[in-house]
């Protein structure tokens, strides 16, 4: 078993097919297929299910992936320890939820100060970003927090006011039972706050419609499709234009914190240390 075999296994697991993995790694497909078969023979167990749509991990394959991710992360960190220079450089893989109002300022400031760092940004929901940080797929991520996890350390980024957004100027709480809720998929912090509020009020929403893009949610509200709950900064432009109306909600549910997370046991590169310093410089509380 060679390090290259583990890299091939990880790529096939992530991409879901031999052809996509071969393209990502710049290998011929037959080489990838052979390496996977050799790995399965060596471990005496099938690691993938083969089907028309590609390949998915078996239970043993999922177990294998946990170890492979850790091994390859350790190898990367070993390289970083010896190659890390005083001047931040290299690749920094960062995840983020879609509504971090301070993110453009943080990224712009960081890039101007450390132009040799290649920032890779990936959008996602809080729960999936936590998982990807734990799996070493991301160096860190901006999520809705705070959270408690023994393997994660977190840094305050911002606190914002949450607003209920509707098409109509007037709103009554009973409308939750007659109007669809427009939300992100499960794993979104704003959705969790909204669902907790409704549960405490004993209200059952008429319908929940899930979206992947914030602007689609807000534009749908503006067209009268439903109502949503988002940070005030995310809807300010539409509210100012009179296309939607914002309503305060009970204080218990009315704010959301954004935190930056990373694995506690990850090697602290100069690039990451400088990124955390930049976050600290731009930390703010926006509750106006």
Curated annotation (Swiss-Prot):
Keyword Transcription regulation: yes
Superkingdom, natural source: Bacteria
Family under the similarity heading: Belongs to the LysR transcriptional regulatory family.
GO MF assignments: DNA-binding transcription factor activity; transcription cis-regulatory region binding
Annotated ranges, domain HTH lysR-type: 1-58
DNA-binding region per UniProt: 18-37
CDD domains hit by this protein: PBP2_YofA_SoxR_like
Record-linked PANTHER family: HTH-TYPE TRANSCRIPTIONAL REGULATOR, HTH-TYPE TRANSCRIPTIONAL REGULATOR GLTR
Pfam family, one: LysR_substrate
Protein name: HTH-type transcriptional regulator CzcR
Annotated organism of origin: Bacillus thuringiensis subsp. konkukian (strain 97-27)
Keyword Transcription regulation among record annotations: yes
Keywords noted in UniProt: DNA-binding, Transcription, Transcription regulation
InterPro entries: LysR_subst-bd (IPR005119), Tscrpt_reg_HTH_LysR (IPR000847), WH-like_DNA-bd_sf (IPR036388), WH_DNA-bd_sf (IPR036390)
